[in-house]
Amino acid sequence: MAHLMMFRDVAVDFSQEEWECLDLEQRDLYRDVMLENYSNMVSLGFCIYQPEAFSLLEKGKEPWKILRDETRGPCPDMQSRCQTKKLLPKNGIFEREIAQLEIMRICKNHSLDCLCFRGDWEGNTQFQTLQDNQEECFKQVIRTCEKRPTFNQHTVFNLHQRLNTGDKLNEFKELGKAFISGSDHTQHQLIHTSEKFCGDKECGNTFLPDSEVIQYQTVHTVKKTYECKECGKSFSLRSSLTGHKRIHTGEKPFKCKDCGKAFRFHSQLSVHKRIHTGEKSYECKECGKAFSCGSDLTRHQRIHTGEKPYECNECRKAFSQRSHLIKHQRIHTGEKPYECKECGKAFTRGSHLTQHQRIHTGEKSHECKECGKAFIRGSNLAQHQNVHVGRKPYKCEKCGKAYIWSSHLARHQRIHTGRKPYECKQCGKTFTWASYLAQHEKIHNERKSYECKECGKTFLHGSEFNRHQKIHTGERNYECKECGKTFFRGSELNRHQKIHTGKRPYECEECGKAFLWGSQLTRHQRMHTGEEPYVCKECGKSFIWGSQLTRHKKIHTDAEPYGCKKSSHIFSHHSYFTEQKIHNSANLCEWTDYGNTFSHESNFAQHQNIYTFEKSYEFKDFEKAFSSSSHFISLL
């Protein structure tokens, strides 16, 4: 009597739990194989009950639901018609060569003894040929078993072996479990091995994600007959081509009823629905974190194992996820597929484009609960919140100064390194910060809009103008708590306080000498490097400090010397024009022989040299001696 074929006789039995463990690619592959099995059964003359079950499978219905509906059994009328129908071999069915892959798919879950046309084919030589082909196929699978791709997929292959009859040719030594086909034997071995590689000697490619191994296995075993007319890409399965076409058309037929989000594949929608239900059935044994999808758990576990299977061929950098490798490779290729439609700016990642577009839309979705200030990026909000809590997480390793923003620390560190990346295009002068360069450029534009009513002096910036007015008012708002000294500017007070603390945070790496201020360290370092950035345009002579260049320029300009209004003394430089203090301030040092007084000990010592004839600096060309090295330098 002929047996009636049902969906469960062709399909691999997946429970609901097992089906949910599969990722999208594995589910699509399952549907393709089952539909191919159905096509082969029909072409060989089988009597199939409920063909609409395969139609439901093609539309995306889960196989465990189809099997559940099928348990109601066939109607008696259908069964009787199938029993009485004379099944004859189709003309020329064995005249063509039956591919091994088709035989494997037909015979994977069935031996020839359980086929419904068994009685009708008794004694037929063609039927015997099919049996021989099946056995030869099994042998071929056994011979090629070691070359086939292996991968670890417990949830896919830990299935019920529902075989009615047939010899079990392959026995697995570890458990003593038997299998009817070499492919089942190979699949079962995957449970006991953690190796994940493609065994094709010609390609030598390696993979770890299960879905890629399955897809890659299909590439090596199945001829690609379905070609996309848009881009020329070919596929071995019609459903793969159908899904691929949606990339070009943008079609997303599967829509979520809760949020309206659409997807290209039904399996993607099924995974998405778990977001709304909150279902997370896959839990990490290491940390207890749960996931809604098994593939997410697999990727997460690589954090604990440190496994990074995806390696960049350019720089050999490894990644735990393939998507991370793809994004990284864009650094080498320069590819920026995400382009802003507003300004044309391109980005390597979609998230970067999303953030950039907020500049055009003005959207600031991250709001501070303390003050209501909104930000475009969450990272900016996180840093802003440090203002309210007083937290300064960014600390300078050189001097210990801390900042709220990482950008402020980066700018501060230029003081220690001496780096001045901002250069004036007009005069070539460099600056540590962009704001300093912007202020400097106003000098060339000669925009001095702030004028002092007291003395008529003009200033570029309002802050400079305000500080200048304190000279006339005598206002000194900044007082030192240690000694009570007052200052015009807060920066002057900060520098002064270092005298009391004795802290010299700016240390020269060459000689170990420490300084109170970064500018002192910068000037000092030029002694080691020999750098002389200040060049005279008249004669080309260069100097370490700007003040030296200023003094030198007076040689070319014939500038009038500095003269004292109270006496007839004349000085070559303003820095030595201190005789005014003799007339206006207390005299600290007195020369006993001549009764002269001086406001500074250094001037007093220099004055003594006049009478003791200690002149140690001699200019050979003029044979002129000087009582001070500074006067000797000033003449140069």
UniProtKB/Swiss-Prot annotation:
GO terms for biological process: regulation of transcription by RNA polymerase II. The keyword Nucleus applies. InterPro entries: KRAB, KRAB_dom_sf, Znf_C2H2_sf, Znf_C2H2_type. Keywords: DNA-binding, Metal-binding, Nucleus, Repeat, Transcription, Transcription regulation, Zinc, Zinc-finger. The keyword Zinc applies. GO terms for cellular component: nucleus. It holds the Pfam family KRAB. GO terms for molecular function: DNA-binding transcription factor activity, RNA polymerase II-specific; RNA polymerase II cis-regulatory region sequence-specific DNA binding; zinc ion binding. Residues 5-76 form the KRAB domain. It is found in: Nucleus. A zinc finger (C2H2-type) spans 196-220, 226-248, 254-276, 282-304, 310-332, 338-360, 366-388, 394-416, 422-444, 450-472, 478-500, 506-528, 534-556. Belongs to the krueppel C2H2-type zinc-finger protein family. May be involved in transcriptional regulation. PANTHER family: ZINC FINGER PROTEIN, ZINC FINGER PROTEIN 566. This is Zinc finger protein 790.
